[in-house]
Each structure stands twice: as structure tokens, then as C-alpha cells.
Amino acid sequence: GLLGRVKGDRYCLLEEGGYLQGSLEIIKNKFAFVDGPEFSVFVPRSKFNTATHGDEVLVKITEDKDGKKKEGEVVKVVKRGSNRVIGIFERSKNFGFVVPTHSFGKDIYIPNKFCVDVPNKKLVVVEVDFWGDAERKPEGRIIDILGDPFDTNVMIEALIERDGLSEEFNMEVKREVKALREMTEEEIKEKRDLRHLPIVTIDGDDAKDLDDAVYVEKFPNGNYKLLVSIADVSHYVKSGSALDKEAYLRGNSVYLVDRVIPMFPRELSNGLCSLNPNENKATFTCEMIFDENGKLIDHDVYKSVIKTAERMTYTNVNKVLAGDTEMTERYANVKDMFFTMLELSKILRKIKRKRGSIDFDLPEIKVI
């Protein structure tokens, strides 16, 4: 456990002293939870003190029901997640203040010299210089004006700023990307060549990074071969490289309602690693053989090179399966495979449901 200083040179385990340490997650600016590996503590808005979303905090447990439902108050900010806060600017006669939209709930005092030209009621970014105490309010400087707080694009920009996201990459990463090249013939020879197969990608209409592709074949004995190929990013991103380190820091791509904050530069995610039609692409392939009842009887995983035959969308695949004349003619080279896919998918779905699987048919939100 974690040690904390109690008094003078005396220490105790924080948990035994009624304290816990974890990351503060503020929900709708009304309450928060401090989460650790084996606990979750509810914190009411009035008990945030100077803590803000993403801070590592120390909480004192004020209520503990049956050891499960804990409630507490923030007594110390151990480490700031960020020194920036998003809020709405309010002007007074000789100064201004910012009302945080997703933070500790205390207004931030802005000296007049830092807000002379800032429009009233706009969403702004504040860099906090002083986090406040029992006598003084937090104080800071406005470093960016985002715009109308009710504008969708502005709200998305605020979200990006709040969570420390960035669409930009550092120069070292950009240099590495610029030096990357398509696969050579020698590199292709080291992989299993699947370019003769009519493999397809199936994605949404707006997808840019096509990272997986499929192929299905039915044998005369009733067995099915299913190939699932995913982009082999490791062909281009080597361990310990600037790209590798940046991807580790980002963790994943972030999908917002109107854009994607990529884990890799777009030259890689939408270019070299995107399984675009009629281009040689490095992939990992899982090859599976199912019998007529959907039982997996064999499988293999290997590095491969593919050349997708078509960039399909869910809409167009459904049109082919529905017998749409235009789509059937357009995709005559792969239409029969879609019916084989449908056949196998029904068999596998039946097995999934027997195992208790649940399908969530959730709508996709899009800004129009």
C-alpha cells in the first residue's frame, strides 16, 4: 500500500488511516469518482476543493457503507493532470473570471491585463498560475479563445483541449514518416502472397483508415475457409522508434463525432497501412477452416501481403444481398462471395447465441 506522513516523522498506510489515492474523474460537473485498482470513491461537487478532472488526488473517506459504497473529500492534489482549465469567461468592471465547465467548480480570477480584449460569455482556455486556498480564489491567464460555448465545433475543440489530445505530431515523428516507403519485392517474398484472392474491406461510408479485410470460400465438402487480414503496422513502425513511442503515449485513435484524432500520422493510418484497393499491403492474416456446422477445425496465423479487390461499404454489401441490379453488376467479381459470407455468418451467429452472446444494434451519431 501507499505510505502517508501522519505527524512529524510518523507514517502510516493511507488506507488504514482512512485515505485513498487515485485519479479524479468529474461527471457532468456535478460529482466525481476517485478510482484506484480496487476501489471507487464518490466525491460530491462541494468536496472537489482545488482538484480538477484527471488529477491524481488524495481523498479522505467520510462515509463507508458496508465497505462497498465509499464517499470522500479531496484533501490534496498529488499531481496535476493539466494546468489548463476550460470555462466560460465572465467580465466584471475591473477584472474577469472564468466559470469552469468541467472542473473543480470554483471561479478563476483573471486580472484585467490578461483579459482586456476577451469577448464576454465565450468559451476560453485558462492557464492556472495559482490554484487557490482558503482565502484566495484560483488565478490564471486566458491563453486561447475557443468561441461560442453552444457551437458544436467549439465544444469539440474544448473536448480536445481538455483531454490533452492533439492532431499534430512532433518533428521527429514527421521525419520518420517521410522516410517510409512502400514494400519492396524482397520484402514481399518474405510474406505469404494472397494477392490472387478477391479480398475486400467492408467499412462505413466515411471510413478513411481501412485496417481489416475479409475473404470467404466454400469447399465442395461443405467446409468454409475464412481469412481475416489486418494491417501489419509493425512492418513500418519499429520498436523504440519515435513513431512507436508516440503511439504508446496516445494509446489509441480517438473517434469524435466529426473527426478522428489518430494514433499515427495520416500518411501511415490512411496511406501506407490503409488496405486501399489494388495496392500491395503488409498484413497479418488469420486463416480459419470451419465445418458445415460452424465448428473451427483448423487455423493458422501468418504474415502476408494482400491486394484488396474492392473497398466495400455496409450499405453497398446490403444492396448486393438484396438483389439491387446496379450494385450486383458493379460488384460482379465479388458478389457470390458476399452470399457465402452471409451463409457462414448465420451459422456462426447461431452458435454465438447458444453461448449467450448479445448483439447491440446501436445507432452511429454524425454531425450534419
Feature map (PLM): residue ranges:
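S1/OB-fold single-stranded RNA-binding interface
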Residues: 1-201, 205-213, 219, 223-227
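Electropositive polyanion-binding surfaces
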Residues: 120, 125, 130-132, 172-368
